[in-house]
Structures are given as structure tokens and as C-alpha cells.
Swiss-Prot record:
SMART domains: EFG_C. Required for accurate and efficient protein synthesis under certain stress conditions. May act as a fidelity factor of the translation reaction, by catalyzing a one-codon backward translocation of tRNAs on improperly translocated ribosomes. Back-translocation proceeds from a post-translocation (POST) complex to a pre-translocation (PRE) complex, thus giving elongation factor G a second chance to translocate the tRNAs correctly. Binds to ribosomes in a GTP-dependent manner. It is an enzyme of class 3 (hydrolase). HAMAP family: LepA. Its main location: membrane. GO terms for molecular function: GTP binding; GTPase activity; guanosine tetraphosphate binding; ribosome binding; translation elongation factor activity. GTP binds at D14, H15, G16, K17, S18, T19, N131, K132, I133, D134. This is Elongation factor 4. It is a peripheral membrane protein. It comes from Ralstonia pickettii (strain 12J). Keywords: Cell inner membrane, Cell membrane, GTP-binding, Hydrolase, Membrane, Nucleotide-binding, Protein biosynthesis.
């Protein structure tokens, strides 16, 4: 037990944690040089392309330290992006230590702070590491100063390394062994193992990644999952080094995988405790994780109606690997049958869409993302509205509408403060705090979540040339003057185009959307009226002019009444068409709503 060290690597996006993980695996001989590839632990294509880590991965390594002992190191790689912070907290709760990787040329950024606080809350020993010291722009002393100022942990003896060249990586491991405590636990006690992650494998069913806290788990054991009460027979246990290696048993302090012939992921909940069947059952489950609540909702619809079942199966399969994705069936008059999906944030939403399109070949229409509003009705009931179409139709019944407010922490170099403050003000933010740390400035704002999901992140990156970083957490619901803007096409409401916006901004948004629709909707044989309305008040209107055939082409000279007759006849025909015709709304129209703000 004394020779085991469980640790994870936390850092801001692009500070080099996956590269450092690669070097550590190479140094410990986890993979031969031939099998070594960049970002070994990022196994999804999307992860490699975008250069981000989404799912936490593990590797059990053995390292011969300078004191001559061989240590078993369990590395758990974590994502750095704010949307996946729940993955980080899960990984950290299985560890005793964390390497806090800071890019020596960039200094401390938003996720560095957020993840580090998560680690400290969970009682994990944080070991600061300065990466990228080979860069000409590296300024390790300044980075150390920032770590101490902003996060408040002692970083005077922070290890310096370069994951790219490999220098200093051995020192990182030595610091890790010296500072991180060995796991506590009793291999002879009743079994308690925490499920850190679970995913679906086509051959063996559900694979669970567990951290054994007490007891010993062997193949052929009968185990009980405490949350569901279901019993299973363990078929195989083992560790990842990063390839899977079967072992006879996993004992207290170890991290490894368990395969028990479970068919669906619902049965193996992340955060659940595995124990033996009575009489050797553990008294109580381990404290799990808090359930993640989706923050952003959007409708996903198949482009072709007959793909609905396929979409449902794809979502079920995705949910096998992504416990935080939530979805329920939904019907829209404009788009037919589809699903209302809940995501952790915008990046999560993009990734789910991309995985559906890539891994399952789905063609999707996505509606504008919305957040959950609470509507207080006159009769005292509270309604949750996560879809603009569900907003109560009669405004006189509504007492108040509450919108979610988030606390946003922003970090940026001094010269961009003005631009960022202007952006936050535009987004109805109120400033809570502002502090200077060397050349970095930290701003704290309270901003409505609805403004963040539109395009806050993209705009923040563009006004700060990519230097600002942010992370946000939910604070509370507040009463707000928001209204629902409906889009009518030829007098018919298109439910999928409805948006909920603040009243001060509603006329502008209505006009913008109507103008955008006019560009996108193809011309028909009759005039198409596009209107934006709040309740019964139309706030904007655009017309798509009709295409017409020149019916007078065959008339040369002659009497005016002949021409009039032909024109009247054409007018009649157009009128009849307008009564029976329906307007096809192209896919771009639904995306246009998202892009209205960007001009």
C-alpha cells in the first residue's frame, strides 16, 4: 500500500497535460516506443482533432524511484474545459494527489483556478508543476508568483519541466512521490469500490473504472451495486497501462477496471459503490458525486422523419458513455418528432452533435440553445420552461419569470479589460469584483445564463484576441423582464424558431431574425410574410417577394383589357396557391437564429 500513488493531472486547456501524461507513460515504460503516439490517452477522434480531453482515462504504471523502491503510480488524466468539470471532480475523488500543470509562458488561467479549488475542496494534495520551460517566452518566476497570488498555495519549489522535450519529467515524479500521501484503506475489510467512470464495450458489455477504497475484489466474486441493489458476477478485473491488462485481484488503494456482464449503463451509475453480496457486504456506500444538472437545452431533430428511431438508438448509445447527457422525446409542428436534449454547456452540446454525426451518421437539425426559466403563475404554481414553445400562452396568467444567473470569473491581460467589461455590460452583467495580479486581471461578473449560451464565449475570445479565459458556475434564479418572441411565416407560428429574450433587446432581436429569415427562405410563387411577434403585437415584418412569370410576353400591342384579363387571372392563381401552399423552411434558418448576434 505504501508504494501506491494515485494522482491526476489538472490544468487549463492547452497547458500540456496530455503531453505530460504521454511523457510519464513513456518514462515508466507503459508503452513501447513503437506504440507511443501523441496524446495516448485521448482515444476519441474528436479529442485528437480539437486537442482537448473529454473523457477521463487512466494508466497504471510502475516507476523505480531514486530511493531504489518501485512505486505503482495510477495516473488519471482529466479534461480541462469548464463544461467537463464534473469529469474532473470524479477523477480527483479517486486520487490523493494532483499535479497542477501551469504553462510557464501563459501563467495561471481560469480553469487552472477552478480545477485547483475543486482539488483543494476534495482534500487532494496539489503539486504545482511548470510546463513548457523550453519556450523562449517562458517566465517561470512570474508563473510561480501568479500561482501564489491567485490560488494561494506555496509554489516556491514548483518542479520545472518541459513535456515536449522530456526534461524534468523524472523530477516531477520524484516530487509526486515525496508530496502525495499513500492511499489509506484496509485490504481485509468488507469491499467498497467507487465507480469513477463506466463505458460500453461491444464485446463485454459495460466496463467500470473503479477505485478500490477498502477490501479486495477478485474475478468470479459476486458483487452488489449499492444504488440499484442489483447483483452481478465479476468476469474480469484488471488495470490499464494504458492497454488493458487482466489481473487476479484489485485491492485497497488500486484503480482498475471491472467487467461484470452488465448490459446497460443505467445499471452501473457513476459514483455508485460496489461491494460483496451479504454476509460480506459493506455497511454504507461511499459518498458519491453530486448529480450533474444540464444547464443548456436544445432540440435535436432528424432531417428525415424516418430517422427518428435511429436517432433514439444513437442517443441511447451515446448516453452509455456520457452520463451527463439527458434527453426526452419532443414534437414540433415545424420539425416533426425529435428530442429535447440537456447539456452541460455549449462545448458539450457541440461535441454531442459532432459525435452523433460522425459515429452514427445522423443528419441533424438543431434548434437554438436555451436555458431553463422558472415561470411563476398567478395561481401560485412554479413551472420549469426549458423550451420556448412551452412558455404559457396567456401572458395574463404569468406573475413573474425568473432566469438563471451565473457567476463568471474572467482572467485576462490588462490591455483587454476595457473590451471585456464592455462585452459584459452588453450582456446585462453586473460587476462584483475586480482584482489585479501582476499583469493579469481577474473580473467577477454576474451574468444571466441565457446571455452566456448565445455566443458569449466566442465574443470574449474575439474581443480579447484569445487571451481571456473564463469559467462560470450557477448562482441563483432571479426575476427578470423576459419575453417570448414568436416568428410567424404567413401567419403560422413556427415553434422551433421561438426565442426567449429580455424585453429591452426584443425588438432588435425580432427585427434581426426576421431580416435573416428573409435572406434564407427561398422565393415562392406567392408573397411570404415573415413576422416577429410578442404575444399579439407584431414587432417586425419582412416580405419575401413572389416569383412571377411574365404572362404578357405573348401580347404584342393590342387592347389593354386583354392584358388586364391575363394579369387578373395570374393574381387569382397566386391567391389560390397562397391558400394551399406551405413554405419549406431550410435547415439554415434554424441555425441563423444562433448567428444573429455575430454581425
Amino acid at each position: 500500500m505504501d508504494n501506491i500513488r494515485n494522482f491526476s493531472i489538472i490544468a487549463h486547456i492547452d497547458h500540456g497535460k496530455s503531453t505530460l501524461a504521454d511523457r510519464i507513460i513513456q518514462l515508466c515504460g507503459g508503452l513501447s516506443d513503437r506504440e507511443m503516439e501523441a496524446q495516448v490517452l485521448d482515444s476519441m477522434d474528436i479529442e485528437k482533432e480539437r486537442g482537448i480531453t473529454i473523457k477521463a482515462q487512466t494508466a497504471a504504471l510502475s516507476y523505480k524511484a531514486r530511493d531504489g523502491k518501485v512505486y505503482n503510480l495510477n495516473l488519471i488524466d482529466t479534461p480541462g474545459h469548464v463544461d467537463f468539470s464534473y469529469e474532473v471532480s470524479r477523477s480527483l475523488s479517486a486520487c490523493e494527489g494532483a499535479l497542477l500543470v501551469v504553462d510557464a509562458s501563459q501563467g495561471v488561467e481560469a480553469q487552472t483556478v477552478a480545477n485547483c479549488y475543486t482539488a483543494i475542496e476534495l482534500g487532494v494534495e496539489v503539486v504545482p508543476v511548470l510546463n513548457k520551460i523550453d519556450l523562449p517566452a517562458a517566465d517561470p518566476d512570474n508563473a510561480i508568483q501568479e500561482i501564489e497570488d491567485v490560488i494561494g498555495i506555496d509554489a516556491a519549489d514548483a518542479t520545472r519541466c518541459s513535456a515536449k522535450t522530456g526534461e524534468g519529467v523524472a523530477d516531477v515524479l520524484e516530487a509526486l512521490i515525496a508530496k502525495v500521501p499513500a492511499p489509506k484503506g484496509d485490504p481485509a475489510a468488507p469491499l467498497q469500490a467507487l465507480i469513477i467512470d463506466s463505458w460500453f464495450d461491444n464485446y463485454v458489455g459495460v466496463v467500470m473504472l473503479v477505485r478500490v477504497v477498502n477490501g479486495t475484489l477478485r474475478a468470479k466474486d459476486k458483487v452488489l451495486l449499492m444504488a440499484t441493489g442489483a447483483q452481478h458476477l465479476v468476469e474480469q478485473v484488471g488495470v490499464f497501462s494504458p492497454k488493458s491488462v487482466p489481473r487476479e485481484s484489485l485491492s485497497a488503494g488500486q484503480v482498475g477496471f471491472v467487467i461484470a456482464g452488465i448490459k446497460e449503463l443505467k445499471a452501473a451509475k457513476v459514483g455508485d459503490t460496489i461491494t460483496h453480496v451479504a454476509p460480506r457486504k459493506a455497511e454504507a456506500p461511499l459518498p458519491g458525486f453530486k448529480e450533474v444538472k444540464p444547464q443548456v437545452f436544445a432540440g435535436l431533430y432528424p432531417v428525415e422523419a424516418n430517422q427518428y428511431e435511429a436517432l433514439r438508438e444513437s442517443l441511447e448509445k451515446l448516453k452509455l458513455n456520457d452520463a451527463s447527457l439527458q434527453y426526452e422525446p419532443e414534437v414540433s409542428q415545424a420539425l416533426g418528432f425529435g428530442f429535447r436534449c440537456g447539456f452541460l454547456g455549449l462545448l458539450h452540446m457541440e461535441i454531442v452533435q459532432e459525435r452523433l454525426e460522425r459515429e452514427f451518421d445522423m443528419d441533424l437539425i438543431t434548434t437554438a440553445p436555451t436555458v431553463v426559466y422558472q415561470v411563476q403563475l398567478r395561481d401560485g404554481t412554479m413551472v420549469q420552461v426549458e423550451n420556448p414553445a412551452k412558455m404559457p400562452a396567456d401572458p395574463s396568467k404569468i406573475e413573474a419569470i425568473l432566469e438563471p444567473i451565473v457567476t463568471v470569473n474572467l482572467y485576462m491581460p490588462q490591455e483587454y479589460v476595457g473590451a471585456v467589461i464592455t462585452l459584459c455590460e452588453q450582456k446585462r452583467g453586473s460587476q462584483i469584483n475586480m482584482s489585479y495580479h501582476g499583469r493579469q486581471v481577474q473580473l467577477t461578473y454576474e451574468i444571466p445564463m441565457g446571455e452566456i449560451v448565445l455566443d458569449f464565449f466566442d465574443r470574449l475570445k474575439s474581443v480579447s484576441r484569445g487571451y481571456a479565459s473564463m469559467d462560470y458556475e450557477f448562482k441563483e434564479y432571479r426575476v427578470s423582464d423576459v419575453v417570448k418572441v414568436d416568428i410567424l411565416i404567413n401567419g403560422d407560428k413556427v415553434d422551433a424558431l421561438s426565442i426567449i429574450v429580455h424585453r429591452s433587446n426584443s425588438t432588435y432581436r425580432g427585427r434581426e431574425v426576421a431580416a435573416k429569415m428573409r435572406e434564407i427562405i427561398p422565393r415562392q410563387m406567392y408573397d411570404v410574410a415573415i413576422q416577429a411577434a410578442i404575444g399579439a403585437n407584431v414587432i417586425a415584418r419582412e416580405n419575401v417577394k413572389a416569383l412571377r412569370k411574365n404572362v404578357l410576353a405573348k401580347c404584342y400591342g393590342g387592347d389593354i383589357s386583354r392584358k388586364k384579363k391575363l394579369l387578373e387571372k395570374q393574381k387569382e392563381g397566386k391567391k389560390r396557391m397562397k391558400q394551399v401552399g406551405t413554405v419549406e423552411i431550410p435547415q439554415e434558418a434554424f441555425l441563423a437564429i444562433l448567428r444573429v448576434e455575430e454581425k
